[in-house]
Amino acid sequence: MNKISFVVPIYNEEENIRKLVEEIQAVAPDLSNDYEILLVDDCSNDGSLPVIRELKTQIPQLRYLSFARNCGQSAALYAGFQAASGDVIITMDADLQNDPTDLRQMYQHYGEFDMINGWRFNRQDTLSKKIASKIGNFVRNWMTKETIHDTGCSLKIMNAEMLKNVRIYKGLHRFLPTLMRMEGAKVIEVKVNHRQRLFGESKYTNLQRGIEGFYDLIAVRWMQSRHLTIEVKEEK
């Protein structure tokens, strides 16, 4: 049985953390009896870290990392990936918009596929965010030759060994399906539920995402063009 690491970046999600951990605990035993919940606090300036510390005293499976300064979502994810002890890594946002119950359906594909990417088919976001996402995914797929509808969906299941070989720079967490394929991963997309945010606020604006995403896209396209694919026919 695979050990599963749930890796969740945290930034100013004080009101959501307890419910988040409860929902993960409710679904985790259906996937594996061996699991850990790894929360990565990106130097939150609210009460997130005290909540995490309290939960740590109550839940044996919970671990956490706390950054000395704010480093961003990509850094939080990368640190979590490297610290995770599981064979399988599952990611999600801390804002409760992802629904962990979808993991039961998604995990059925693991083994045949090395990465299962969620697709927020019916997004509970503003119209402007939906439009920006559709444009972003279209341009991204056109340039990278990808077919994933929703690379920005944080609900993902990934082979840990492959994932730890991926070099993640600032912003490149948005391109994980492409980066995992470069490691030889088989990737599938599964429709998932998407819920409205109840507490807190989004940490990004559409303009910020668009500008950063464009430069990140150029970087990933360059990485694809320089990637070495070697297939040994014979060795004696």
Regions found by a protein language model. Name each.
Residues 1-127, 161, 187-190, 230, ...:
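Structured catalytic core of nucleotide-sugar glycosyltransferases
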Residues 26, 30, 54, 58, ...:
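Conserved amphipathic alpha-helical interaction elements at protein-protein interfaces in regulatory
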Residues 7, 53, 78-81, 107, ...:
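Conserved protein kinase catalytic domain
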Residues 19, 47, 105, 130-134, ...:
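Generic alpha-helical secondary structure signal
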Residues 1, 145, 169-236:
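Hydrophobic helical membrane-anchoring modules
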Residues 70, 126-129, 133, 170, ...:
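Short-chain dehydrogenase/reductase
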Residues 82, 156, 173:
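Residues that recognize and position ribonucleotide moieties
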